[in-house]
């Protein structure tokens, strides 16, 4: 359990390192990184893993990606550009490692998630892999990211800590709102979401409940759920305080949600509502999301012949399919 905790801390620093680096590139200045900016970190890792897998097996770059994330995290620490409660972040890390330590891997992860991750790790994108097994054609960016971090430290593979890291950031963000006296809608929504997850897990008859039982598995169900909830939170946050940075985070989080699990496509209604209300995303974020979507669609087409598998209307006839 101790080694799992140490490796989780390593992955958290990698995500925060990429979050700081992404913000530096995007905003052209080294502004402070907050807990909610983990969205930037995951987005940049999604984008990087997708882009690299077009050309090389991801196992060739896993170590270098981890090292870069850690180094940029340390650089940002030295520059004092983090505005994050690291004490609560560490405490939540310990909590989730403790409750998930002996749960084992879920059935779906054993059946096909691990195989999908290993294929992306060992090979470039494989033409028509969805024809071999439909599950391999499910184009989840989360699994592509897991393929990028398919590497062991201290006998612990990072892929088993991915969703634990996400839950840690999520709960840490909620803890920031507990001390606020006059709680706004975003605070209330986030706190109630945490209360529901914990209550459901506490009263569920089977171990930690079907939500927290997924911790430690490279699955997409709880991951997409957290991204979905966080998208709604960012939506309320922007409504409450029309800050452009929150608007950018919302669009990135919506992309993370949909590209992790396509069944959450309904979340795109949130940015549409904002556009109808007269709010517009800037050109830079539009180009970034468009490029990320382009890579995701092309990857899906190469793997299955469909832009969005298994939606048949998105399939394109070709001589190779």
Please name every model-derived segment.
Residues 184-226, 234:
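Aromatic- and kink-enriched transmembrane "portal" helix at the membrane-lumen/periplasm boundary
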Residues 48-53, 246-262, 267-273, 291-294, ...:
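Membrane-interface alpha helices of multi-pass inner-membrane proteins
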Residues 101-104, 145, 284-321:
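Membrane-lumen/periplasm interface segments of specific transmembrane helices
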Residues 97-192, 213-217:
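Active-site lumenal/periplasmic loops and adjacent helix-entry segments of GT-C-fold
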Residues 55, 102, 152, 218-219, ...:
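Transmembrane helix irregularities
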Residues 223, 228-247:
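Membrane-interface transmembrane helices that cradle and orient dolichyl/undecaprenyl
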Residues 70-82, 267-290:
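Perimembrane helix-loop-helix junctions
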Residues 1-80:
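Membrane-embedded, hydrophobic transmembrane alpha-helices
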